[in-house]
Amino acid sequence: MEKPFKIAISNGLTAPAIQVQSPEDLSTALRELDLHSPRPILVVVGGASKVSEADLSRLRLLFVKVLAPLAEELGASVVDGGTDVGVMQMMGQARAEIAATFPLIGVTPAAKVALPDRIPSSKVTALEPHHTHFVLVPGSNWGDESPWLARVASVLANGAPSVTVLVNGGETAWKDVSENLKANRPLLVIAGSGRLADTLAAALRGEATDERARELVASGLAQAIDLTESFDSLTRLLNEMFSAKGGRSASRESG
């Protein structure tokens, strides 16, 4: 396992990063990054594609008014994919906007992101500049990081409550959701945010959908709340999920 190094991201901002090759190295790697457990973990997965401007504005407020303040209040760490797009960008910007101090950890394939020692390429994606730590993992395709992201969350939680929030999302988010459910992590689906989130919200309402969605409902770990619900309602539901006995929540649809 390599030692941590600093990544210069943008505007003079830097963040510590570490590259791992084996799941067995994760505990040591996270300690090397000065990330300690146990602590509550919020996992954020999904995207922001094909979202209307009105819904996009509402989504940004979800991060600024609910997710970032909740993480700060709980003393949680937040784990996501770390790139400067979609929900990961929103999470980083929300953390900066409220001047939060919680660790924001990006887990991403080393081969898919722009790194200081690499010749610039249109084939790589920029890292989000407000993340505080990066874990760089093996893989050459988006989705290769999904099991690693779930493992990072589990290692950091170390028995403390953890919850996954799904916003929008496509095929990679399916992998993220699946891996986090394997880890017995409750899932909150933001209904009305589009694509995968709406597919899963429909399944939670009992509407006919594909087999993967039916399996998710059968897990009993997933529930949904509509994007149009009040931010107080969203905050209250997430607090309930974090405090649920054993970290499990009953499946239901709100709104």
Identify the meaning behind each predicted range.
Residues 216, 227-251, 255:
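SIR2/sirtuin-family catalytic core signature
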Residues 2-235:
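Acidic/glycine-enriched connector segments
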